[in-house]
C-alpha cells in the first residue's frame, strides 16, 4: 500500500510540474488558484496529490513512534547489606561489652629497619661490632613481640628532650666533620621514640670562611665622609642656644605689649558704652514710653576698676621720673588728690516710675502741644 501510494504520488508530481512549466511558457507567469479551477482535470490531480501526501505523512509518523518507543524494563531492587547487631555503648568507653582503657590501644607492628654496612675506608665513624650485634638482637625481639595477638605497653616515661651531649671544640683548620647517628640512642630509647636517629642519618658541619679583616684595616686611605657621625662643634651649639634664648625673650616682650594694648582698648570701649547707656535729660516722656527694653537684674557684683587705666599708667611713669630726677613725691600726691576730688562727682539718683499696663494704650487721640497731626489744624 505504501509503495503504490508513493509511486502514484511521484507520477502526479511529475505531471503537475510539466503542466506548470507549459503554462509558464505560454502565459509568462506562474498559475494561480483561478487558473487551476479553470482546468478540472488539473484540479482533480492536485486534490489527489494532497490526499496521498497526507496519508504518507500519517504512516511515517506511526512508524517512527513505534521505532523510538522504549520497552518496559523490569525493576530490580537494590540488595541490602547485611545489618550486624547493634553495638551498645555505655557511659564508660567500651566496645562489644568490654571496657576500653587508654592503655589498650591498637599499635601497628614495627617495621624492620635495614642496617647499612659501612666500609672500613669511609670517612664516617663506624659502629663497634658489639653494638651492632646488640641492635640486631633487639630488633628481632621487637618483631617477635609485634607478631603476638596482644601487646603490653611499656610504662617507661619517654623524655621530652634529647639527651645533652658534650660538644667538642671545633678546630678552624679541621676538614668537614661527619657524625654518625648516636649509637646509644637505640639502647636508651624505644623503637618509636621521636628522639631516636635512624642508621642513615648523618649530620655535616662545614667550616665557616673567615674574612680578611686585617687586610681591610691596613688600607692607607680614610673612610668615606658619609660614614662619619654627623655632629656639630660645641661652639656652634652654644651660639644656637643663645639665639634661641633671645628669640624667646623677644616673643615674651611682644606678648606683654600686646596684652597691655588689648586691656587699654577694652577699657575705652567700656567707657564709651557707659556714656551711651546714660539717658539724656532732654528726651520726652512719649519717647521713653516706646522703649520697653529694661536691663536685666544684676545677680553678681562685678568688680569695676576705679578710674582710667591709661591715666594710672601715666601717673606711675611720672612718679618714676620724679624719683629719678630727685623731685619731692609729696607734691605729686597733693595734685593727685585734687584731681581725684574734682573728678569724683556725686551720682544722681534716678527716679524710676512704675509703668502700669494702661499706659500702653490711648483712649483718645487729642491734640497736644507737641503733636504734628494735620487733621486738627484743618478744622
UniProtKB/Swiss-Prot annotation:
Acidic residues bias locations: 266-276
Gene Ontology molecular function terms on file: DNA replication origin binding; single-stranded DNA binding
Source superkingdom: Eukaryota
Cell compartment(s), UniProt: Cytoplasm; Nucleus
Compositional bias segments (type: Polar residues): 67-78
GO biological-process terms attached to the record: DNA replication initiation; double-strand break repair via break-induced replication; mitotic DNA replication checkpoint signaling; mitotic DNA replication preinitiation complex assembly; negative regulation of protein-containing complex assembly
The keyword Ion transport is annotated on this UniProt entry: no
Keywords: Cell cycle, Cytoplasm, DNA replication, Nucleus
GO cellular component terms attached to this protein's record: cytoplasm; DNA replication preinitiation complex
Any Pfam family matching the protein: Drc1-Sld2
CDD domains on file: RecQL4_SLD2_NTD (cd22289)
Region entry Disordered, spans: 60-79, 263-292, 322-379
PANTHER family found in the cross-reference section: DNA REPLICATION REGULATOR SLD2
Function: Has a role in the initiation of DNA replication. Required at S-phase checkpoint.
Family designation: Belongs to the SLD2 family.
UniProt-recorded name of the protein: DNA replication regulator SLD2
Organism this protein belongs to: Eremothecium gossypii (strain ATCC 10895 / CBS 109.51 / FGSC 9923 / NRRL Y-1056)
Amino acid at each position: 500500500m505504501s509503495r503504490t501510494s508513493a509511486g502514484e504520488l511521484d507520477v502526479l508530481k511529475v505531471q503537475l510540474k510539466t503542466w506548470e512549466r507549459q503554462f509558464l511558457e505560454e502565459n509568462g507567469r506562474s498559475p494561480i488558484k483561478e487558473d487551476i479551477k479553470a482546468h478540472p482535470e488539473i484540479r482533480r490531480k492536485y486534490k489527489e496529490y494532497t490526499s496521498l501526501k497526507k496519508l504518507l505523512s500519517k504512516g511515517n509518523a506511526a512508524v517512527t513512534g513505534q521505532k523510538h518507543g522504549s520497552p518496559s524494563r523490569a525493576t530490580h531492587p537494590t540488595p541490602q547489606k547485611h545489618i550486624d547487631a547493634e553495638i551498645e555503648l555505655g557511659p564508660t568507653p567500651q566496645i562489644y561489652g568490654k571496657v576500653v582503657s587508654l592503655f589498650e590501644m591498637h599499635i601497628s607492628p614495627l617495621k624492620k629497619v635495614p642496617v647499612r654496612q659501612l666500609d672500613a675506608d669511609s670517612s664516617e665513624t663506624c659502629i663497634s661490632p658489639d653494638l651492632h650485634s646488640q641492635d640486631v638482637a633487639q630488633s628481632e625481639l621487637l618483631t617477635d613481640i609485634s607478631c603476638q595477638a596482644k601487646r603490653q605497653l611499656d610504662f617507661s616515661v619517654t623524655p621530652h628532650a634529647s639527651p645533652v651531649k658534650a660538644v667538642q671544640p671545633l678546630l678552624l683548620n679541621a676538614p668537614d666533620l661527619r657524625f654518625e647517628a648516636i649509637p646509644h640512642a637505640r639502647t636508651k630509647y624505644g623503637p618509636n621514640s621521636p628522639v631516636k636517629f635512624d642508621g642513615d642519618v648523618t649530620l655535616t658541619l662545614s667550616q665557616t670562611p673567615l674574612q680578611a679583616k686585617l687586610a681591610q684595616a691596613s688600607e692607607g686611605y680614610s673612610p668615606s665622609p658619609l660614614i662619619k657621625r654627623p655632629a656639630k662643634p660645641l661652639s656652634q651649639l652654644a651660639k644656637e642656644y643663645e639665639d634661641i634664648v633671645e628669640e624667646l625673650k623677644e616673643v615674651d616682650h611682644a606678648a606683654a605689649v600686646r596684652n597691655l594694648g588689648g586691656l587699654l582698648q577694652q577699657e575705652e570701649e567700656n567707657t564709651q558704652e557707659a556714656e551711651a547707656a546714660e539717658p539724656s535729660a532732654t528726651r520726652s516722656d512719649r519717647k521713653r514710653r516706646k522703649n520697653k527694653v529694661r536691663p536685666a537684674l544684676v545677680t553678681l557684683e562685678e568688680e569695676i576698676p576705679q578710674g582710667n587705666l591709661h591715666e594710672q599708667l601715666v601717673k606711675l611713669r611720672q612718679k618714676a621720673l620724679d624719683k629719678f630726677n630727685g623731685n619731692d613725691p609729696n607734691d605729686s600726691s597733693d595734685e593727685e588728690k585734687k584731681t581725684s576730688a574734682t573728678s569724683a562727682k556725686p551720682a544722681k539718683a534716678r527716679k524710676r516710675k512704675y509703668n502700669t499696663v494702661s499706659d500702653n494704650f490711648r483712649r483718645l487721640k487729642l491734640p497736644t502741644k507737641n503733636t504734628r497731626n494735620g487733621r486738627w489744624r484743618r478744622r
